[in-house]
């Protein structure tokens, strides 16, 4: 019974932390965005891609799961991302995906898909302002690394 209470308390804390994302949280830095998704994504066993949609003042409108992949890849097409961003009237977006290995170093595939998503964003007028790769308690920001 005590173990169940502890698990429930931990889950409640996790949900309250993620609720912050839905209550007009402002993204000022890559670490702000990472903070929103880190606890939920760091232990996933499969690659998952999330989309953080922002308004003109970089306030979070919504966070949406876009795709769930395998152990080492997440298949995503730019249209899947921008359909959601357009529906939400996003001014800009941040994409985040995890590496189940715990190592957030971007792969060549990560860099290629980021370029495609960025190009699509220019066409539809919704800026991709960052791509975060989430590892175990750490992350890599494409913006900070000059890859965007």
Where are these regions (language model features)?
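Helix-hairpin-helix
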Residues: 1-9
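Alpha-helical scaffold segments in soluble metabolic enzymes
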Residues: 5, 36, 116
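The DNA-recognition helices of helix-turn-helix-type DNA-binding domains
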Residues: 9-13, 102
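Histidine/lysine/aspartate-rich catalytic loop segments that bind and position anionic ligands
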Residues: 34-88, 92
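Active-site-proximal loop/helix of nucleotide/amide-processing enzymes and allied scaffolds
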Residues: 67, 71-148
């Amino acid at each position: 019974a005590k173990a169940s209470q502890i698990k429930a308390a931990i889950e409640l804390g996790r949900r309250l932390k993620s609720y912050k994302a839905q209550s007009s949280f402002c993204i000022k830095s890559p670490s702000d965005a990472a903070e929103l998704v880190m606890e939920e994504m760091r232990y996933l066993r499969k690659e998952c891609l999330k989309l953080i949609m922002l308004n003109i003042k970089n306030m979070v409108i919504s966070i949406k799961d876009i795709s769930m992949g395998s152990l080492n890849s997440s298949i995503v097409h730019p249209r899947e991302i921008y359909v959601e961003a357009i529906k939400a009237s996003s001014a800009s977006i941040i994409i985040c995906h995890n590496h189940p290995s715990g190592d957030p170093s971007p792969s060549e595939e990560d860099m290629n898909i980021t370029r495609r998503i960025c190009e699509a964003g220019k066409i539809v007028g919704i800026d991709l302002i960052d791509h975060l790769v989430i590892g175990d308690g750490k992350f890599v920001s494409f913006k900070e690394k000059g890859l965007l």
